[in-house]
């Protein structure tokens, strides 16, 4: 049996590194590969404030992606993304479970090394805190970023905790990783501070506006900056994604979210993640399927640039 040794440790997990996204064979040598995009599972959920279990998200998303692998041309796209992009799955990040500091160091180092070798990162969480070390790695490589953030929560809360999945986008502007005035948060429907100049597109507004209007606002906000795209699955209404740690009623439908994503093809998206899938609360794997579909849609955004 082959084991992942990402970050120099041997992975003996029973729930990770079994098979790849879209049935891709696992590639445990991602840095030396010829990949355009590298998928990494991030089984971390020690920063949650509600229900835990997102550490099982990568495995659930990969398992659900089997249902998507058969379709050569993902509807409504007109090409097979696997023919346009060299995509590999390098398995799950290996870190000392229970040690958040070690996780942050390993996550940032792994993403930074991939970028230095000319790869791009699609990360499967895991709770939303994983985005902070990913932003650090990407900002070091690309400079200050614009953020496109799908979520029910702004995650701009200042509670003094170093490791919390609700504080990343308070910390990231302070560290100079993102420009909040060029960043947009979509699907928000919880109380939040207005001290930071994020463009907030609330769930009621997004559901009321046309998809074209929402896409226009996103593009107008981020402009031509390098973009990091993060999708918290609780952006979707719980009827479409019950399997998550902090579900909030009144969210987006999966159809609307996918249509918005498809409108972002001409943006300079340099890194992406899908987070907060917690399969123990799921029903019939619909949340995992939503996460897998969104991840695949993100890859199609990149493939569309090859036109």
From Swiss-Prot:
It comes from the Bacteria. Keywords: Hydrolase, Manganese, Metal-binding, Polyamine biosynthesis, Putrescine biosynthesis, Spermidine biosynthesis. This is Agmatinase. Pathway: Amine and polyamine biosynthesis; putrescine biosynthesis via agmatine pathway; putrescine from agmatine: step 1/1. It comes from Neisseria gonorrhoeae (strain ATCC 700825 / FA 1090). It is an enzyme of class 3 (hydrolase). Its cofactor is Mn(2+). It catalyses: agmatine + H2O = urea + putrescine. GO terms for molecular function: agmatinase activity; manganese ion binding. InterPro entries: Agmatinase, Agmatinase-rel, Ureohydrolase, Ureohydrolase_dom_sf, Ureohydrolase_Mn_BS. Catalyzes the formation of putrescine from agmatine. Its EC number is 3.5.3.11. One of its GO terms (biological process) is spermidine biosynthetic process. Pfam families: Arginase. Mn(2+) binds at residues 128, 151, 153, 155, 232, 234. PROSITE patterns: ARGINASE_1, ARGINASE_2.
């Amino acid at each position: 049996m082959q084991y992942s040794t990402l970050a120099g440790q041997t992975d003996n997990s029973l729930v990770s590194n079994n098979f790849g996204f879209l049935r891709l064979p696992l590639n445990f040598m991602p840095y030396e590969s010829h990949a355009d995009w590298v998928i990494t599972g991030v089984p971390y959920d020690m920063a949650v404030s509600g229900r835990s279990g997102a550490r099982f998200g990568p495995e659930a998303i990969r398992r659900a992606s089997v249902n998507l692998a058969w379709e050569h041309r993902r509807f409504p796209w007109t090409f097979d993304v696997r023919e346009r992009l060299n995509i590999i799955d390098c398995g799950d990040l290996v870190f000392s479970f229970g040690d958040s500091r070690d996780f942050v160091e390993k996550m940032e180092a792994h993403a930074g090394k991939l970028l230095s070798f000319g790869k791009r990162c699609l990360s499967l969480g895991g709770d939303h805190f994983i985005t902070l070390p990913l932003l650090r790695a990407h900002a070091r490589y690309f400079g200050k970023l614009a953020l496109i953030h799908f979520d029910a929560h702004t995650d701009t809360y200042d509670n003094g905790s170093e490791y919390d999945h609700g504080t990343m986008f308070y910390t990231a502007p302070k560290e100079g990783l993102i420009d909040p005035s060029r960043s947009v948060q979509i699907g928000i429907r919880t109380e939040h501070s207005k001290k930071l100049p994020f463009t907030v597109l609330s769930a009621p507004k997004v559901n009321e506006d046309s998809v074209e209007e929402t896409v226009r606002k996103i593009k107008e906000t981020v402009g031509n900056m390098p973009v990091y795209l993060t999708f918290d699955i609780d952006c979707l209404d719980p009827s479409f994604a019950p399997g998550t740690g902090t579900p909030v009623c009144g969210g987006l439908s999966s159809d609307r979210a996918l249509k918005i994503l498809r409108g972002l093809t001409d943006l300079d998206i340099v890194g992406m993640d899908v987070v907060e899938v917690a399969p123990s609360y799921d029903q019939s794997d619909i949340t995992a399927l939503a996460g897998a579909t969104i991840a695949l849609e993100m890859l199609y955004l990149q493939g569309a640039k090859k036109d």
